[in-house]
Amino acid sequence: MAEQKSSNGGGGGGDVVINVPVEEASRRSKEMASPESEKGVPFSKSPSPEISKLVGSPNKPPRAPNQNNVGLTQRKSFARSVYSKPKSRFVDPSCPVDTSILEEEVREQLGAGFSFSRASPNNKSNRSVGSPAPVTPSKVVVEKDEDEEIYKKVKLNREMRSKISTLALIESAFFVVILSALVASLTINVLKHHTFWGLEVWKWCVLVMVIFSGMLVTNWFMRLIVFLIETNFLLRRKVLYFVHGLKKSVQVFIWLCLILVAWILLFNHDVKRSPAATKVLKCITRTLISILTGAFFWLVKTLLLKILAANFNVNNFFDRIQDSVFHQYVLQTLSGLPLMEEAERVGREPSTGHLSFATVVKKGTVKEKKVIDMGKVHKMKREKVSAWTMRVLMEAVRTSGLSTISDTLDETAYGEGKEQADREITSEMEALAAAYHVFRNVAQPFFNYIEEEDLLRFMIKEEVDLVFPLFDGAAETGRITRKAFTEWVVKVYTSRRALAHSLNDTKTAVKQLNKLVTAILMVVTVVIWLLLLEVATTKVLLFFSTQLVALAFIIGSTCKNLFESIVFVFVMHPYDVGDRCVVDGVAMLVEEMNLLTTVFLKLNNEKVYYPNAVLATKPISNYFRSPNMGETVEFSISFSTPVSKIAHLKERIAEYLEQNPQHWAPVHSVVVKEIENMNKLKMALYSDHTITFQENRERNLRRTELSLAIKRMLEDLHIDYTLLPQDINLTKKN
């Protein structure tokens, strides 16, 4: 079976998906490989246990770790069972990985001729920019509206084409039986005038048909309405998301309306009946009215929650989802074959590519492939994005992990000859391994960097212009180093993981709010039912009111906290999962966000639980949402230091900041804060990072490098600090 991959489009502007068989991918890789790349590299000595688990053979790069292998540099056994669940979402239970030590050990095992920067066989071709290769059109349905966000919607009319369930067969058979009985009661003279409990047989047949087959008929009706809306382009743009969300509620509401109308019309209330029978009929009628009222409230509740969830997700997650989807597209494109270069012979016009992702169906292990047009994703605006498009993008992030096209890399690197699905990255260790594979797939042989020409073999010029600034130092040097590429892949994985947790927690919070509102609606419906039945008289209502007042003293504080938590989560929303915040002066990472509580993770991985009602009263600093943050480095020099040396020191500091534009902003200031004890100048350097304090480890590393650089400057300029002269009294003993 061939795996479905996203292509970079055709010249006609159509969106296509290509199927690359495993045999063909292997054959292409062998044709593109050079003789040098096919030669084996002898081992210098037998590999160590750690490297042998990582490296398959002399010509094969290390595999990405999985559940069956150990970590890259694992030298100790885990203290806890491997079957226990991780206690944190953001803390991997693996040992730390030192990439420099790893490379040295692998080089020792593979020989001096091995280089981690050596490219894959895909790279042994001339550097040139071609256009997409001819592809085989697949069943990709793409919108043609340039103003509306374009997405791949594979499930258009899926319900119309789905298999008939067993329940539907039973309902259909029952409908046919009741319909036959109705026809018989209207045509056969014996049954035409026969009555049962004072009601004709045909009326009983109609009533039974409405009650037991009404859902079947309304289901057909709703499918027809949804089909008309889906095929009507102007309507589908904005209301499709709400149509699918409200379909079941509207269906139940229409069914209850039919039952109530049939009950009122079929039973002739002018007919004289016994008082008991009349009372029963009134009770049933009023019960149906109360149930219909509850169904209407349920419909309104569903609509309001859908609007709340849609607006909340667009306002808080759209930008992050847009970036995450683009990053996944970049990773998948760079991990595959250089389609632009292969298409050079055909000469088709280049266009933006497509991102394919698989969603896991809850009922079973089937995965549904979907495709998103990246060109239209770039053009989306938060103010114009529709709820349905937002749902598709959220599904792409929440139900599928960060993945690479692993079969191409595995075929060329390992030569196992078996097809594999897109490999999802599930840990930082696997992100490191994936970064190695992708870098080796893109870079030229024996090159330790990637240039713009290398990326143009996989993407069009417009996409390369968007990708290049993502890597540290690439915009200044015009090259992407392996270290910068690896750091970017790890950063993409961590941000994708945090975003997926945020979407899942938001969905959980909406479900909890839905349960709360449902409970309130059930109570309201019961009260309306009691009022219609005239059971809840004034005395009864007065009694319940006094009980509610007494209950308010008991659960009043709980209700207040619940309301404040809802406002905090859905209105204030000062942070998302994965954000680093400061609460009560302590920097913590948001681990989990629920409707009532938030779980934080300290720098030492200690979990802290805060009620949201308490957090609503506290000032919260959010590093992730902050702009590039400033840094202050204080140091002291001797009061006797000449002004010329201080000026020279400022020039050296400015030169250092200009030489590291990927770490520091050029705008800075060196000031004298104060003079202490007439022998010391307390100075401070104020400069801005190119990052926020969200990346705490990176911030500390940059600050350390800056402090050491200032130390070297002080030593070179012979600037030091001396104590004040001290009076020493000596006494001589006889």
UniProtKB/Swiss-Prot annotation:
Domain of life (superkingdom): Eukaryota
Subcellular location: Cell membrane
Membrane topology recorded in Swiss-Prot or TrEMBL: Multi-pass membrane protein
Any one GO molecular-function label of the UniProt entry: mechanosensitive monoatomic ion channel activity
Biased composition (Polar residues): 65-75, 117-129
Biased composition (Basic and acidic residues): 24-39
Ranges where the record places region Disordered: 1-75, 115-136
Signal peptide range: none
BP-aspect Gene Ontology terms: detection of mechanical stimulus; leaf senescence; monoatomic anion transport; programmed cell death in response to reactive oxygen species
Gene Ontology cellular component annotations, sorted alphabetically: plasma membrane
Tissues expressing this chain: Detected in the root tip and throughout the vasculature of the root and leaf.
Residues recorded as bearing Phosphoserine in the entry: 34, 128, 131
UniProt keyword Glycosyltransferase, yes or no: no
Membrane listed as a keyword: yes
Keywords, sorted A to Z: Cell membrane, Ion channel, Ion transport, Membrane, Phosphoprotein, Transmembrane, Transmembrane helix, Transport
TM region positions: 164-184, 196-216, 249-269, 288-308, 516-536, 551-571
Family of this protein: Belongs to the MscS (TC 1.A.23) family.
Function: Mechanosensitive channel that opens in response to stretch forces in the membrane lipid bilayer.
PANTHER family: MECHANOSENSITIVE ION CHANNEL PROTEIN 10, MECHANOSENSITIVE ION CHANNEL PROTEIN 5
Name this protein carries in UniProt: Mechanosensitive ion channel protein 10
